[in-house]
Structure formats: C-alpha cells, structure tokens
C-alpha cells in the first residue's frame, strides 16, 4: 500500500460502509505504532518525511472512516471520482422541498422570537423545537444506516448503486439543513457547546 | 543518540527532567531546588536568571522580566490590556512584542532562551555531559505562533527542540508510567498563566487525545491580580494612598498577594504585613480563604466552559470520564478542586507533584523519541481550527480543531491576473467565521509560478501540521510539476533569518569559534545520517535492487571519506547526496511498515495465545 491509497485501502478494508469501530481503532493504533514520527527521530531524512506523510494519511483516514456521516461523504466522493471534497456541491443536491420550506418557517419563527426578546415562553418553544429537530436528525441518520447496509449488499455491476448513492446524497443534504437550523436554535438558547466551525462545514 | 532532556517552560517556574532508569526525575540546582523561577533580570553587571533575578523584582522592576510566557507569539494589541500590571515597557508595534530593558529591546523568545539556557546548564552540571537536545512543553491551547516562538527560544538557547509537546498530555504520560493503564481521562491543567483541559483515551500504551480546549491567558497570575486590585482599593480606602502608580510597591504587593494566595490553600486565614516607608505607612491586613474564594470564583468558573466544550468535542458526558488528573500549581487551591469535582462528579487525582508532573512527562516523551520506550505512543490533536482567508474576509477551514496530528489538507489555488507569478495566502487559526476575528498566523507567498493566462495555473498547496502542532506549507504547480517556493511572513514571530542572525550573534558574544562549531554540527549531522542509513539498509536491503544498494553504498562511502576532513561544505554536500540516495529505500521501508501493521494479529488475540 502506498501514500496514494484511498482511506479504505489504508486500513485494508473493502469499500463498505459498515465498519466495526473496535477493529478500525485496533488497526489505527497498530498503524500509528509503525509510522508515527516519534519512532523515526533517528531515521534518515527520507524516513522522517515519509513517516510524517503516512502518519498524516493514517490520521486523516481514521478521522474520516470512524464516523458514519463522513464515511458516506467520502464514499460518494470516491465513487464520483472527485479528488477533494471541494466539489462538495455534488453532495448538496436539493434537500426535499417540504423540508426546506419547514426549516425556513422555523428560522423565521426564531427570528421573530429573538426580535421580541425571547421571553420564558418563547425559550421553551425554541427548546422544544430544538429537541424535535435533534430527533428528526436521528431519524435521518437511522435512514442513512439502512442505506449503508443496502449499499454493502449490492454487487459491483448492480444498477442500484447509482440510485443508492443518490438517496444517500439526499439524506446528507437533509441532515445538513437540519444541522444549520439546530445550530441556530442552540445558539439562541446560549448553549456553550456550540460548534462554530463544524456547522459551517455542512 | 545523545541524551534528550524534558523541559517545562512555565509562566512562573521552569524545570528540567531526564529519564533515570525506568522513571523520570527532575534535576535540582546546586542548592537542591528544582523550580527555576521564570524571571530574567537585565542588570548593569549582567543578566541574572531564576532565584537571583527574582530578588531584583522589587528593586529593579523595569529591568526584571517575569511571566514572559504570556507574551510568547503575541502582538502588542493582544497584551495591551494587561500591561498596567507589568512594570516593564513594551514598544508599540504591529508585529512581535518587544520589551524595553534599558537601552535595548528584547523579544519574548530571547528572554525565554535565557531561561532555557539556565536549565541546559543545570542539566549539564548534573549529568556531567553536554545537553543539546530537548523536548519542551507548551500549553495545549497554544496556537502556531506561540509554539513557533517556543521552538525559536530553544534554538536561541543552543538546544535542538526535537518536539513541542502539550503540557496536559505530557502529564498524562507521567501518570501513565505509574498507574494510568486504560480508560478515559480528563487532565485539568491550571498553571501560572494558562489553562488547558485535555480529554484522553488510554489503551494498550496509546494515549489518544480526543479533544482539548483552554485559555492561554488564564491562571494563577490572574488570581494574584484580583487580590492585588483588592489590596489597592483597601489601601486607598484606609490610608488614602494610591499605590497603583508606584511600580516598586506594585511588585511588593504582587509578591505578597501570591504568597498569601498560596498560604490560603492550607490555612483558613492569613495575615499580611507590608511596610511602605516611602509612603509612610505599613499595610496590615488579615484575609480569610472565603474572601479569596469570592474574588477568584468568577475566574475559576471561566475554566468550566472549555471543559464542557472539550467534553462535547470528545462526544462524552462528564460521567463517562474515568479519572480526572490535576496539573499545575493553581490546582492546589481548594476552590479549584471543588469546582472540578462538581463538574466531573468524581474526586480528582494529584498523586504526582502538580509542579513537576509536566517536566516528568516531557522526559518520558524525550525517552520515547530516543527509542528508549517503544510501547507508549502519544497521539495529540491540534487545538484550534486552521484555515485561510477567502473572498469577502471569510475564514475557510482546512483542518478543524481537535484533529489528530500529524495531519494535512490540500487546497487548489490559481491566479486572478494574466502573467501573475506570485500568489498570496493568509493563514488563520481560530473558530470564528470572519477572518479578522481569528488569529493571523502568517502570510505565505507562493513564488516562481510560470506566467500564464489568469486562472490557468493549478497550484496544489499542502498544509501539513506536524507532531509539534506547527504548520508547514508546500506548494506545487500541477501543469509544470514545479515546486513553488513558499515565503513565510509570520504575523507575530521571528522570521527564520532573524533567528539565524540572533544565533550567530550569540556565538560572537560567547567568543566561540563559529567555524569550528559549524564544522562540528556538520559532522554530527553526517553521523546521524550514516547511522540511520546503515540501520535502514540492515532492515530493508531485500526491498531494493542491486543497483540501488550500490548507489547507496557509494554515497555512504563518499561521506565516510570526507567526514573527518575540515571541509564543511564537502561534508554537507555528501550528507545531502546520501539523503537523496536513500529516499526510495525510506519510502519502501515505510510502506512495508504499513503492510506489516495490517498483517499483525490483534493484541488481545496474541495475549490469549501466550496465556493458554
């Protein structure tokens, strides 16, 4: 295996979406033990550079594969033959129209509530809405897991592959919209654990 | 490999440690003291460091620099607000902070270098051998500029800094040797000037940091200031005197406040008596622990937000943390312990001396790098998101915070004008949406792009964060395959050229023979590469063909031939040629290592077999 390997190949895995997290972690630790720069301090400059490069690859691969959502995103990127996540426009087709409309409604309601100073009753409504959307997101993620299992079952030449990829892309898009609104609601509630960065990445 | 020491370069105190057998040990000075106060005094008779410098604080406040760590990698604007607490003056500047001492101005890395040099000398005296290599710790929440400044300080002190390691994770290594074998661990590190929280997963010798957060401007210093402000108001009310304008009195108050704070960790009440003959008064005051706690409670509360954020980033609940470890002198304060215990719902550990544990851990990491420990590995993360400024002044994140390092990200750039040969990038660190709200790390200029029509060049830029958490940038134009040279202009740091010049100047001051020193360095480097090549050949001869082995053998023989000569350029040239000759072998070895990793059996499986 070389530095050009894709993330599945890095860990010696088939291009499947169901991955045993313990086994993935075991391989990650094992590979880190072999290539981490700590162990090449006395190596040739070539070894030091090579270990740095491979260690970065192994870390990126682990980070991407350990989480279902980023794993699916990466798989789509691979299947579509894109070099980077840059073309992520491809991952953002339209979310279902009704979801979009609903999210706009929630956003407007939130703006209105904020403009009125967010009193106790309004806070409670925002909180309930927040909880509802978190649940909704969990449903989407369950759907993604089902699709992932289906993907693992279809063979290489199967015509269903394309359709499955499209369906996964739609779930990712829906999830991204939900995330934006969930974060906005969370911010309005003054949650400390807001992730400024990650919500922008979707 | 020669001995590598571990150094904790602290805000208030610094320490050096080494591996003595299986366990690390801190190195005392001739008087048996292990803590070196991080104070440097520039006196007419010369430079003092440590205990003797600390004694100058009250007499010569303007020439005695303390807490310089707060200025490392910072700009004037960053520290302006706290300057009223410091007796020394800073030159207003847009770039790196410069501290005025007498008729000269020194940068924070230069001051830190003097502290490091004192530790280096202490270690050399104790070990009876030259010490040239070190692992230095920094707060986990230090950004790229602050890390780079620390590395620069090491170089200025004549130390090769093999690794910058995070303080809380260093502490976890020290604990790991003793008792931490498996589980999730929160390391709460509150020192003199900085606060860090790191959440780790420990398993089979791997210390994997899941998330880290903190505040590089929050620590014991701030508690002292709260107390000083309270004393100032009290003196004004009772004696009608404003001591705030008297730098010497301020130093007296600061030191008294620090001492009172420390006593109140053990006693319920304490009494202060400070004579101020120049103001015709003696300040006498009893203070209770509860009063101190009321003053510092808001500051202690400020550490809890980062703790919750780190937990969220690690996707863990407080209840899922198996152990909480306390590090840093400020964790001796009972209120701090109470707040930590409330948050995590369990009694925190502090078996190892909180002042020493970071240096001990640095020595462990040093031993790992030297090859003395092979079954422990620390996998750390980058504390802040790294990105570039894009159109409209927005920060585009390339590497999110809490990504395991080393890591890299690739980004494509092009030109916007015909014939353009230079492309600018502004690299930022932080969590905010707008570029201007984040930390400016550096501006990079990609040069040497072949003139083409606008938008034609395809420049692939690789942002690589190494195991020190320090950024390296490489660029390549894909059409021509030519590497673009990258010029770095650090926003709040020294350029490589400046560090180089300072190093040379320090040689001149030491009246050392620069030429012979450079020759020795070249020979040392040659020896390292010779040894590494011999080892690589031993391990990987079967991976390469006869021609390649012959080429490497030839380059090795050439280097061995010139190694003992006095021609530094010949040694360096032959070293570089040997490096080039071994590049492919190195790649082959690395790939073989990855393959072996995949083929290896799970550890548990192996254990079961040996047991049965």
Residues of each region from the PLM?
Chain A
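C-terminal accessory/regulatory regions appended to core domains
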Residues: 1-202
């Amino acid at each position: 295996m070389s530095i050009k390997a894709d993330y599945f190949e890095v860990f010696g895995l088939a291009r499947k979406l169901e991955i045993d997290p313990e086994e993935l972690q075991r391989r990650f630790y094992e590979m880190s033990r072999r290539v981490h720069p700590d162990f090449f301090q006395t190596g040739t400059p070539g070894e030091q550079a090579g270990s740095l490069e491979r260690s970065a690859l192994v870390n990126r691969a682990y980070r991407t594969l350990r989480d279902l959502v980023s794993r699916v995103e990466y798989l789509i990127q691979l299947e579509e033959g894109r070099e980077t996540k840059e073309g992520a426009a491809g991952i953002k087709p339209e979310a279902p129209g009704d979801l979009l409309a609903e999210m706009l409604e929630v956003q407007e309601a939130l703006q209105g509530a904020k403009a009125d100073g967010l009193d106790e009753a309004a806070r409670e409504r925002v909180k309930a809405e927040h909880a509802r959307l978190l649940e909704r997101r969990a449903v989407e993620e369950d759907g993604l897991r089902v699709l992932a299992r289906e993907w693992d079952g279809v063979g290489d030449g199967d015509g269903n592959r394309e359709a499955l990829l499209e369906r996964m892309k739609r779930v990712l898009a829906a999830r991204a919209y939900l995330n934006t609104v969930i974060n906005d609601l969370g911010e309005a509630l003054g949650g400390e654990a807001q992730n400024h960065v990650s919500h922008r990445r979707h | 490999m020669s001995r590598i020491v571990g150094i904790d370069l602290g805000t208030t105190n610094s320490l050096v440690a080494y591996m003595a057998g299986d366990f690390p040990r801190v190195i005392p000075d001739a008087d048996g003291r292990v803590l070196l106060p991080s104070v440097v005094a520039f006196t007419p008779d010369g430079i003092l460091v440590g205990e003797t410098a600390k004694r100058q604080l009250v007499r010569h406040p303007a020439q005695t620099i303390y807490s310089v760590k707060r200025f490392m990698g910072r700009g004037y604007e960053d520290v302006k607000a706290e300057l009223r607490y410091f007796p020394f003056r800073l030159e207003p500047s847009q770039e790196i902070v410069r501290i005025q001492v007498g008729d000269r101005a020194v940068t924070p890395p230069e001051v830190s270098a003097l502290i490091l040099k004192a530790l280096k000398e202490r270690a050399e005296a104790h070990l009876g051998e030259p010490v040239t290599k070190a692992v230095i710790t920094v707060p986990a929440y230090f950004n790229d500029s602050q890390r780079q400044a620390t590395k620069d300080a090491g170089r200025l002190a004549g130390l090769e800094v093999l690794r910058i390691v995070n303080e809380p994770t260093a502490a976890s290594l020290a604990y790991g040797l003793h008792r931490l074998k498996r589980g999730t661990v929160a390391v709460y590190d509150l020192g003199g000037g900085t606060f860090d929280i790191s959440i780790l997963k420990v398993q089979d010798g791997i210390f994997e940091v899941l998330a880290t957060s903190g505040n590089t401007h929050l620590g014991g210093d701030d508690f002292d200031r709260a107390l000083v402000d309270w004393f100032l108001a009290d003196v004004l009310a009772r004696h009608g005197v404003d001591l705030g304008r008297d730098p010497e009195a301020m130093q007296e108050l600061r030191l008294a406040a620090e001492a009172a704070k420390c006593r109140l960790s053990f006693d319920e009440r304490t009494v202060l008596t400070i004579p101020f003959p120049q103001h015709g008064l003696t300040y006498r005051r009893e203070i209770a622990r509860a009063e101190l706690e009321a003053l510092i409670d808001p500051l202690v509360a400020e550490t809890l937000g980062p703790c919750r954020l780190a937990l969220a980033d690690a996707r863990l609940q407080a209840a899922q943390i198996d152990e909480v470890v306390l590090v840093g002198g400020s964790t001796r304060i009972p209120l701090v312990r109470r707040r930590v215990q409330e948050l995590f719902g369990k009694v925190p550990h502090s078996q190892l001396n909180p002042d020493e544990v970071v240096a001990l851990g640095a020595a462990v990491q040093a031993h790992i790098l030297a090859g003395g420990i092979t079954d422990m590995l620390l996998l750390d993360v980058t504390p802040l998101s790294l990105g570039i400024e894009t159109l409209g002044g927005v920060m585009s994140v390339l590497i999110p915070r809490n990504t395991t390092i080393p890591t890299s990200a690739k980004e494509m750039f092009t030109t916007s004008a015909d014939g353009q040969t230079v492309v600018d990038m502004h690299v930022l660190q932080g969590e905010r949406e707008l570029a201007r709200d984040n930390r400016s790390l550096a501006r990079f200029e990609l040069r040497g792009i072949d003139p083409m029509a606008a938008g034609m060049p395809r420049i692939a830029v690789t942002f690589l964060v190494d195991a020190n958490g320090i950024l390296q940038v490489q660029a390549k134009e894909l059409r021509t395959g030519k590497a673009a040279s990258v010029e770095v202009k650090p926003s709040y740091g020294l350029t490589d050229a400046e560090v180089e010049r300072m190093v040379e100047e320090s040689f001149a001051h030491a009246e050392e023979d620069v030429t012979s020193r450079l020759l020795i360095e070249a020979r040392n480097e040659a020896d390292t590469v010779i040894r590494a090549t011999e080892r690589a050949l031993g391990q990987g001869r079967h991976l390469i063909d006869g021609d390649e082995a012959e080429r490497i053998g030839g380059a090795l023989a050439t280097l061995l031939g010139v190694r003992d000569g006095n021609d530094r350029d010949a040694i360096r040239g032959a070293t570089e040629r040997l490096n080039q000759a071994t590049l492919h072998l190195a790649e082959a070895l690395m790939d073989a290592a990855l393959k072996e990793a995949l083929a290896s059996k799970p550890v548990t499986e192996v254990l079961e077999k040996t047991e049965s």
